[in-house]
């Protein structure tokens, strides 16, 4: 398992969760963001959401933690018009979705202890940095680069 990539993906997700919440709150004022996102999830993702929500309610955790990589992809596809506003155009939104799909695949491999090729690792780091650039999140880009440098340090 690539520990640096796993750490970078975790950090990336922590930054993206508030982004999703902010976009939903901005575009659907007066509606709970959880309900807006939940309504767009597939049946299977809704089932997983419910299980996670029950566990979260027991532990008193933050509902933002219900957002995972699978939900990021669903969010970007289901709320593409809103994503277009955030990233500046339809082509950029399509790239944003592709980057998230790439990251979801890398995250799944990391989570299931499957080996990633050096190319897959580079693509995952690149996808995180490209999303950070698209969203003008300089701190995210810098942190991903720092984690990546640690990976390549002797």
Predicted region positions:
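Amphipathic alpha-helical interface elements
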Residues: 1-154
């Amino acid at each position: 398992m690539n520990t640096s990539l796993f750490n970078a993906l975790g950090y990336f997700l922590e930054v993206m969760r508030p982004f999703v919440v902010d976009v939903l709150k901005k575009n659907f004022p007066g509606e709970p963001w959880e309900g807006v996102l939940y309504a767009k999830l597939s049946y299977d993702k809704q089932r997983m959401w419910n299980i996670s929500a029950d566990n979260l309610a027991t532990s008193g955790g933050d509902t933002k933690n219900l957002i995972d990589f699978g939900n990021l992809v669903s969010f970007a596809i289901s709320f593409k018009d809103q994503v277009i506003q955030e990233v500046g155009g339809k082509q950029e939104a399509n790239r944003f979705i592709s980057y998230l799909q790439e990251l979801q695949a890398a995250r799944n491999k990391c989570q299931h202890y499957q080996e990633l090729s050096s190319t897959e690792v580079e693509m995952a780091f690149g996808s995180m940095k490209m999303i950070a650039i698209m969203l003008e999140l300089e701190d995210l880009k810098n942190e991903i680069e720092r984690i990546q440098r640690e990976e390549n340090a002797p």
